[in-house]
Amino acid sequence: MKEIKVIIAGPRGRMGHEAVLLMERTEHFNLVAAVDYKHGGEKISDLPGMPALHAPIYADLHTCLDEVEADVLLDLTTPEVGKQHVTLAVERGLRSVIGTTGFTEEELARLTENAKEKAVGTIIAPNFAIGAVLMMKFSQMAAKYFQDVEVIELHHDQKLDAPSGTAVKTVELIRQNRESKQQGHPNEVEQLAGARGANVDGIHIHSVRLPGLIAHQEVMFGGDGQMLTVRHDSFNRASFMSGVKLSIETVMNLDHLVYGLENIID
């Protein structure tokens, strides 16, 4: 396979560290630079726990893109920074794979239009774990037969956004096969505000944040005399790397924006 030159934004995070290791062990990936505002001017190998890769680190993406030739930007930063980076990447005509979440429908629509206009491949993935993507697809299928559903997502206590992008994407897919319906008793009253979680078109999403967790989600469907639960668990961040690898390889052949890995797997 042809070499793919990659820039990683956010190499010091746990996902970023795993992505650097992915670069090291994948023959056709070449890590040409990284973006980290705290370590501009250093090299990847200078960071604690990193492999002996000598890709330069830039403090900001603007400077990096001015000085480095790359094929793909892999962004694993924060929602706020990720939005800035994908916008800049599209403007510069650089393909990007975005692992941050928190995009609004309006922001996605604008990015989709811009990527189409520039004919630049872009993938925004709420979850890179292939198992999680299948969980979402299975939930979408089940919603055709089970109209009563709630979502519980559980993550580590350092996660910045709630509900998770995976939960939001799951509900979006379920809504495609489910009539609008308020889940629970029509006259129910919350004795404590927020007790029933977030509400999206009648579907409740419950977010749990605890140390010891990584990324977990279960989608619970109820029916007469039966329950169906679709669950996925990521026990470490290596579980996301197969999806990262697939996304980097796939985005090379795209000329538009794709939201969600379910749209690039068979």
Swiss-Prot record:
The organism of origin for this protein: Bacillus cereus (strain B4264)
Family: Belongs to the DapB family.
Catalytic activity: (S)-2,3,4,5-tetrahydrodipicolinate + NAD(+) + H2O = (2S,4S)-4-hydroxy-2,3,4,5-tetrahydrodipicolinate + NADH + H(+); (S)-2,3,4,5-tetrahydrodipicolinate + NADP(+) + H2O = (2S,4S)-4-hydroxy-2,3,4,5-tetrahydrodipicolinate + NADPH + H(+)
Primary location recorded for the protein, binned into one broad class: cytoplasm
Domain of life: Bacteria
Residues given in the record as NAD(+) binding sites: G10, P11, R12, G13, R14, M15, G99, T100, T101, A125, P126, N127, F128
Any Gene Ontology biological process: lysine biosynthetic process via diaminopimelate
PANTHER family hit by this protein: 4-HYDROXY-TETRAHYDRODIPICOLINATE REDUCTASE 1, CHLOROPLASTIC-RELATED, DIHYDRODIPICOLINATE REDUCTASE
Binding site for (S)-2,3,4,5-tetrahydrodipicolinate: H156, G165, T166
Compartments it resides in: Cytoplasm
HAMAP family: DapB
Protein name: 4-hydroxy-tetrahydrodipicolinate reductase
